[in-house]
Amino acid sequence: MSDIELHESAIPKELDSPVTTIALYNNHLYFGTEGGDVFLYNFSNFQLNESPELVKKISLVSKSRVNRILAMPFLGAVFIHHGSFAEVYKEDDLTQLYPSISFKGLVEFCHPGQRIDEKSTYLIVTNTHLKLISFQKDGIILVKNELKYPNIQTARVNGHIVCLVTENSFELLDILTFDTTPLFPIIKYDSENNGLMYKPMIVLHSNEFLLITGSPKDAIGLFVDSQGNVTRSTLTFSFYPKHVFSTSHYVFAISSSSLQIIDINTLSLVKSINLKDDESFSFISRLTSVHFCDRQIFSKFSAVNTASTSKTSDTIERASFSKPSFIFLTNKSWGFGAEAHFMNKLEFSITIGDIEAPLRRVSKRLRNPKKYGITNDVAYLQSAYLEQISALQYWKQGQYENSLSLLETSKIDPRVVISLYPDLYHSELSYIAFQGVISFRKSILSVDDTVANVLKSNELFRDTDQYTQRQMIEITKENAYIMLMRYLKNYKKNTSISEYLLSSQRDVMLAVEHSLLLLYLNMDDLAAGTKNAKELLESGLTGVEDIKDVLIQKKEYYLLSVLLATVRDHDGVLQTWKKLITGDYEDRRFNDGLIKIREYLVNDIEPSTFWEFTTWLCKHDATEGTRVLLDKTVSGSISAEDVLEHLDSSQDDVLIDYLVKSNSVTHRALLLKLCVNKLLGSLLDHNDFKNRLETAIETFRELPCMEKPTYAQYLEQLWGDMSDFSTHLSFYYLCSINLMENVEEESIDKIKDILFDIHVDNLYLFPQLEHSFYKRKKNYEKALSVLVTNIHDYKGGEAYCLQIDDVYPQCWCNLLEKCISTGDGCSDFIKELLYRRPFSYTLSYVCEQIPDHWNLNLLADFLCILQKRNAERLNESQTRLTLEKSLSQNLEELFMAINRRNVALGKNEI
């Protein structure tokens, strides 16, 4: 009770006469005045700071001071004692319940016990009598007992025992037997002016009576039982009380300027409350079964920056209910006296660091609200409030894991937490929160100062060197930021949101996304920060434009492109990447730009945008450009005709690669033309390659004829040795040769101009290409000449003759002649040729072609084969002649035998 608080409200403006008494029951508030008026107000909301609603005002006939208004719940009425009169009025409209009955000469009216809810019997004390009467609902008043007993100043009844005060002493009276028991005299004090006497008091406390008497300076109180025995030590007051009442544990007494609360067991002063200088107490009375809304708690629970609904207001009001111990009246105000709200007590414990016990207590209320007489909504509200306060207190103490756990369950506005980090928080950021949470938040310093304060209280920190202190500060700050990152990330993933935040859901998510992005951008681990930021941007944002502005301001162009991709701004994505590749933008997060463009272009993009950036990519990286075209062709998005339409002549490399890999049969002629033109035309830019080819051909020509391979075999090795040059040239060469062998006849004619007019000067460097051209044109002599005459490819020439032997038999003679025309170096090959193809030549022809200065020994093998062949032929002729003679003889003998057989058969028949 030491934390008792007074909750005051101004006296309603309608009361123009001094107020003398007050009563509250069943949502009805009554004021009695010095002039005999009674005011009835509705007080259903229990809002002390709001003016109650005036229901009715009555003026009593006596015009006397209203001494007391006592509730009579059994009758739904109030007993109004004014001057020496009293009547019973209905509680809701102040009409008389017993119009014909008025109590006169009344001194005291009281109930025989502490609880009056279901009782109808009351003690009436008049100037001359004591009466125990019963009020009936049917309008009848029964007098149970009556005793003539004049000059009673005050009395209280407990059961059938009445404690009363006469002019001289306290006495006990049995109202049933009329037996009296004198107790002790009262203290009389006569002032110098008008003989003023301080009236003794009797307070009923459980089964005891507290008897009070004394002087203006002090007073004493004695506790006696129903037999008159003193039950406790003497109670002393530092003033003579104006009013006194008791509860099971305390005695409350008021003077004009102060309220004293005394422990009834120890009889020691617990607390003294003094009024302001211009105020004075005039009345105090005990209250039971009454609740009121504690405005301080109501204010704490009220959410700032959001409109409340009737449901939320009602929940807040019920969560703020406090049970007062008494009602009081001063010359300027009225109100309740109540212990500090349990929420204030729990919050105080939390703010001094004792967090777990209050959380356990509120958790019990949340699990079983009916047990505590509250609704689920009230229990949730109280729990959420204390959890939010606890989360902030844990953060303040540097206990970030505990703080994180409570932040996620308490449904706090994330912007409250964000505001603790100045580098993420901007001044225009507002948040929706309990007023009490906002007030507590204002008492917490920013993250830097809070971390410093936490560590300063650490003895280990104080005893270490400055370098280690700086390290500890940085680590603790990092933990604080990690906690925030985890909290905001989880909040972003969680789709549920508190009801009171629904109206500001967009603003909340904007703040969360903005802060998360800044946290990721500030991460020391660039890869992890980029990954997290990318996931955030791709998760779906509430404020795309706001985040876009942040990324532009921070020059985070790669992440900007990620954001643009989420809204399908294809042109924006590709333009950003293009500028990063060309150096107009710089961003350390960006890499593999050309690959990224290629992968992005495979998506479903507007044709104009696709071709704009595909052609750009082809110019900067033919390989990646070709891959895009191939992928889109395979998917059916584009055709070869589309590619031919959009690629210009400067992109022949890409077009060739595309046509080859797409295996476009209908465009082989174009491909052949492109390859040949590219191959021959590129030599202007590749002098080293041209020189290498010339050297290679000359080297091949000079190789010993029997050791050299075919030129085709030699060429394969050549490309391997020339890997330092553009591999495209070798590709064009080989592709041209392959296409020359497979394209239609009319396609061959289309490249004639390229070969023999435009690039004729370079054609000699590519003998296989020239040979293939003549071969397809069936110009066998020219085709053979290219191989043998031009490059001395004797083995290649022989292989070619084997291919055309059936259609061009004279090729062997051409081969021999062209080989001999190349000089003496081919003699060994001719020797082998004559040996392998002896029957393709006549001896006379060979002798005519062989130069005179050549050694005829090279013909030895050739002549041997011819001689052997002639011998075989002669032998075959002689054998044939012998066989013919033998056959003729055999036939003759056969015919003779047949004739003899026929003659014999004829004779038998006769």
From Swiss-Prot:
<dbReference type="InterPro" id="IPR036322">
    <property type="entry name" value="WD40_repeat_dom_sf"/>
</dbReference>
<feature type="repeat" description="TPR 4">
    <location>
        <begin position="674"/>
        <end position="710"/>
    </location>
</feature>
<dbReference type="GO" id="GO:0034058">
    <property type="term" value="P:endosomal vesicle fusion"/>
</dbReference>
<feature type="repeat" description="TPR 2">
    <location>
        <begin position="383"/>
        <end position="416"/>
    </location>
</feature>
<feature type="repeat" description="TPR 3">
    <location>
        <begin position="554"/>
        <end position="587"/>
    </location>
</feature>
<dbReference type="GO" id="GO:0005634">
    <property type="term" value="C:nucleus"/>
</dbReference>
<dbReference type="Pfam" id="PF00780">
    <property type="entry name" value="CNH"/>
</dbReference>
<keyword id="KW-0813">Transport</keyword>
<dbReference type="GO" id="GO:0005737">
    <property type="term" value="C:cytoplasm"/>
</dbReference>
<keyword id="KW-0963">Cytoplasm</keyword>
<feature type="domain" description="CNH">
    <location>
        <begin position="16"/>
        <end position="288"/>
    </location>
</feature>
<keyword id="KW-0677">Repeat</keyword>
<dbReference type="InterPro" id="IPR032914">
    <property type="entry name" value="Vam6/VPS39/TRAP1"/>
</dbReference>
<dbReference type="GO" id="GO:0005829">
    <property type="term" value="C:cytosol"/>
</dbReference>
<dbReference type="GO" id="GO:0006886">
    <property type="term" value="P:intracellular protein transport"/>
</dbReference>
<dbReference type="GO" id="GO:0033263">
    <property type="term" value="C:CORVET complex"/>
</dbReference>
<comment type="similarity">
    <text>Belongs to the VPS3 family.</text>
</comment>
<dbReference type="InterPro" id="IPR001180">
    <property type="entry name" value="CNH_dom"/>
</dbReference>
<keyword id="KW-0653">Protein transport</keyword>
<protein>
    <recommendedName>
        <fullName>Vacuolar protein sorting-associated protein 3</fullName>
    </recommendedName>
</protein>
<dbReference type="GO" id="GO:0045324">
    <property type="term" value="P:late endosome to vacuole transport"/>
</dbReference>
<feature type="repeat" description="TPR 6">
    <location>
        <begin position="763"/>
        <end position="797"/>
    </location>
</feature>
<dbReference type="GO" id="GO:0006914">
    <property type="term" value="P:autophagy"/>
</dbReference>
<feature type="repeat" description="TPR 5">
    <location>
        <begin position="712"/>
        <end position="743"/>
    </location>
</feature>
<feature type="repeat" description="TPR 1">
    <location>
        <begin position="69"/>
        <end position="101"/>
    </location>
</feature>
<comment type="function">
    <text>Required for sorting and processing of soluble vacuolar proteins.</text>
</comment>
<keyword id="KW-0802">TPR repeat</keyword>
<dbReference type="GO" id="GO:0016020">
    <property type="term" value="C:membrane"/>
</dbReference>
